[in-house]
């Protein structure tokens, strides 16, 4: 006989509430999708006519350059953040120094400090280093923001790691590098990869900091999107927003899948 007690009823109510909240939060995002196919010269919903002209406009070199810059920067940032964030997580978790709490706070501070304050300070520093409007300027700035997205999940994975596996590997003659490659890395890999995806998203979608360090000759997709929204109301931005939304959804789904695929340490 099916359970129809109060707990089941409460669970169903919670599910309905969660679904309604999710719809309320996501509906404004997905309204952009049909607008991107609108044949109108202004934002209108629902569209009266349908066309792919907005997506054809993305062949403009301005949009292509912005997209290539964003993707290239985001990939480099994801790689650098994965390496630096993993090393930082090892130092934070494995070190017994009392200073590690301060180090952790410093690493995570870019996520706490108002982005405008951080961007202004970074802009003044980059002016002296001639990094404003450069590829590596964007990479450095975005990496600072993205490293915490790797440190947090990798630290959590290391804290739950069974250290006896590493000690057993060492007792069998494996060196630190071999132990890390064959024992530690396979266990924390889902955390590293999910952190890398979040770092990629952080860089690809970042606009406030990019506005401080961009130049007329080097800019990212969010910056170009902001320019179009402030200079002229161009419906092409709906197509760009849909493209960004698709990439973000794909990356989030992949990150969630990787995060859920934690290897069983009993099988190692």
Regions found by a protein language model. Give the residues of each.
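C-terminal transmembrane helix and the adjacent membrane-cytosol boundary/short C-terminal tail
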Residues: 2-16, 99, 155-166, 170, ...
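A structural signal for multi-pass alpha-helical bundles of membrane permease subunits
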Residues: 27-40, 69, 119-129, 197-203, ...
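Generic hydrophobic transmembrane alpha-helix motif, especially the helices
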Residues: 104-138, 149, 190-193
């Amino acid at each position: 006989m099916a359970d129809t007690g109060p707990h089941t009823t409460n669970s169903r109510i919670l599910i309905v509430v969660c679904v309604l909240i999710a719809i309320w939060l996501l509906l404004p995002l997905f309204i952009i999708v049909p607008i991107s196919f609108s044949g109108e010269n202004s934002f209108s919903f629902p569209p009266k006519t349908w066309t792919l002209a907005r997506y054809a406009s993305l062949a403009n070199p301005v949009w292509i350059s912005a997209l290539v810059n964003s993707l290239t920067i985001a990939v480099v940032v994801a790689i650098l953040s994965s390496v630096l964030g993993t090393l930082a997580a090892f130092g934070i978790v494995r070190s017994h120094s009392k200073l590690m709490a301060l180090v952790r706070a410093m690493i995570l501070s870019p996520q706490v400090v108002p982005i405008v304050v951080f961007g202004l300070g970074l802009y003044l520093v980059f002016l002296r280093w001639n990094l404003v409007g450069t590829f590596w300027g964007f990479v450095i700035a975005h990496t600072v923001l993205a490293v915490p997205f790797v440190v947090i999940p990798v630290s959590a994975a290391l804290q739950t790691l069974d250290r006896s596996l590493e000690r057993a590997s060492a007792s069998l003659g494996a060196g630190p590098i071999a132990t890390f490659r064959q024992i530690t890395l396979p266990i924390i890999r889902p955390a590293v990869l999910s952190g890398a995806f979040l770092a990629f998203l952080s860089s690809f979608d970042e606009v406030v900091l990019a506005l401080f360090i961009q130049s007329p000759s080097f800019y990212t997709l969010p910056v170009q999107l902001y320019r179009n929204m402030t200079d002229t109301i161009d419906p092409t931005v709906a197509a760009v927003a849909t493209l960004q939304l698709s990439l973000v959804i794909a990356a989030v789904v992949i990150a969630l899948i990787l995060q859920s695929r934690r290897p069983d340490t009993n099988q190692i």
